[in-house]
Swiss-Prot record:
Changing D215A: High decrease in both AMP and CMP incorporation. Changing E173A: High decrease in both AMP and CMP incorporation. CTP binds at S41, K44, H129, K149, Y158. It comes from Saccharolobus shibatae (strain ATCC 51178 / DSM 5389 / JCM 8931 / NBRC 15437 / B12) (Sulfolobus shibatae). This is CCA-adding enzyme. The gene is cca.
Length: 412
């Protein structure tokens, strides 16, 4: 059975676990006398073999407040690990990433609260998530979560960060707890039609998102609030087709040969000079993508597709147009002959005539008809960056080929 084969690949061995435990021993020594716990998928037993990142939470009394975490707590942690290979990262508040033997350990300051619904910062709920999941999943259930995670990674819908807008690890765990197994999650998802409500607990307020899973440890929160409709739909379609014809392609998609370029494709390569948090950068990239698309359409271009990918240093925006060539002039459609606005139309336009349909028309010159210039002008990054832009002629870049192909390898 395919799922058993996948598990052999993704389930960590005892050696894998020992390797991470050795790294954690180093961290434990550095955090001695602090109130800390290992959290996340490693602690819950739902981690994948290829994932070598571990979460360690350092807890402080809730009375010290959020500002204390951002300054005092962070400095305390840095002083304890400053001789190790570490970098600062940013979410709701800063945290530290330590790299030891190719294992990434996220050391996150948090506040110790009585229950998940009393969380002051988002990370304060984490230990309650851990307790909930470990009390509701047996060993087989953990393997079912692993299968679901790998499936979602394979089809590109895993990861709650803004860049992806997909399913979090916690969401996959709750789905398996609710439905009972990987296959049962897929059977349900294949029939989804939004809005979808999955209630392990009764919500404490109304939610408007397309997929609603109230957090069992804090029912005021929707666990899947960040999941985009596109990713919900992709997961549903993939579930349907996997159940029809199970394949390793869903878990480990293959690379395809070069695709034919249809239309004109503009590639914008951005190299960022400054570091910032991933969510901040990708919030600006998504706004840029929307602004570019809107500006191109307003200028008369027919946009087939526009996508962005990359990390926090190097980003690619690909714009696919029916054609990069549009006329310098265009037909401007005016009001009907009996409209009170015809005087205004006549004053503002030249080359005016009355059409066979009784409507006034004119010829107008486009303000902008260079698609490349329009796209570059509508990038709204707030950090310094260099940009290289070109019209695609050919490529061996796998991500660009994926953009050209459109159809996921698991679908066809």
């Amino acid at each position: 059975m395919i799922e058993e084969e996948v598990l052999k690949i993704i389930k960590p061995t005892e050696e894998d676990k020992k390797g991470i435990e050795k790294v954690l021993e180093i961290i434990r020594e550095r955090l001695n006398k602090l109130d800390f716990e290992v959290e996340g998928s490693f602690r819950k037993g739902t981690w994948l073999r290829q994932d070598t990142d571990v979460d360690v939470f350092v807890f402080y009394p809730k009375d010290v407040g959020k500002e204390y975490l951002e300054r005092n707590a962070l400095n305390d942690i840095i002083n304890r690990i400053k001789d190790l290979d570490y970098t600062l990262a940013y979410a709701e508040h800063p945290y530290v990433i330590v790299n030891i033997n190719n294992v990434e350990v996220d050391i996150v300051p948090a506040l110790r609260v009585e229950s998940g619904d009393r969380a002051i910062t988002a990370v304060d709920r984490t230990p309650f998530h851990t307790k909930y999941v470990t009390s509701h999943l047996d060993e087989r259930g953990k393997d079912e979560v692993r299968l679901l995670k790998r499936f979602m990674k394979g089809i590109g819908v895993y990861g709650a960060e803004l860049k992806v807008q997909g399913f979090s690890g916690y969401a996959t765990e709750l789905l398996v707890i609710y439905y009972g197994s990987f296959r049962k999650v897929l059977e349900a998802a294949s029939k989804w039609k939004h809005p979808i409500k999955i209630e392990l607990t009764k919500p404490m307020r109304a939610f408007s998102e397309p997929l609603i899973i109230p957090d069992p440890v804090d029912p005021r929160r929707n666990v899947t609030a960040a999941v985009s409709l596109k990713n919900i739909a992709t997961f549903s379609v993939a579930a349907k087709y996997y159940l029809k014809n199970p394949s390793m392609e869903f878990f480990f998609p293959s690379k395809k040969v070069e695709e034919k370029i249809k239309g004109d494709v503009l590639i914008l390569r951005l190299n960022l000079d400054e570091k910032s948090s991933e969510d901040i950068i990708w919030g600006q990239i998504k706004r840029s993508v929307n602004k570019i698309e809107r500006a191109l359409k307003q200028s008369g271009f027919r946009v087939i597709d526009i996508q962005a990918w990359g990390d926090t240093s190097n980003i690619v925006i690909a714009v696919q147009l029916e054609s990069k060539n549009i006329g310098q002039y265009y037909l401007n459609i005016g009001p009907q002959y009996y409209s009170e606005t015809i005087d205004d139309f006549i004053q503002k336009n030249d080359n005016i005539w009355v059409g066979e349909d009784g409507r006034l028309y004119s010829i107008k010159e486009r303000k902008e008809y260079n698609a490349e210039a329009i796209a570059k002008k509508n990038i709204v990054l707030k950090v310094k960056y260099n940009i290289e832009s070109y019209w695609l002629q050919n490529t061996e870049d796998q991500q660009i080929m994926k953009f050209l192909r459109k159809t996921p390898t698991w679908l066809k």
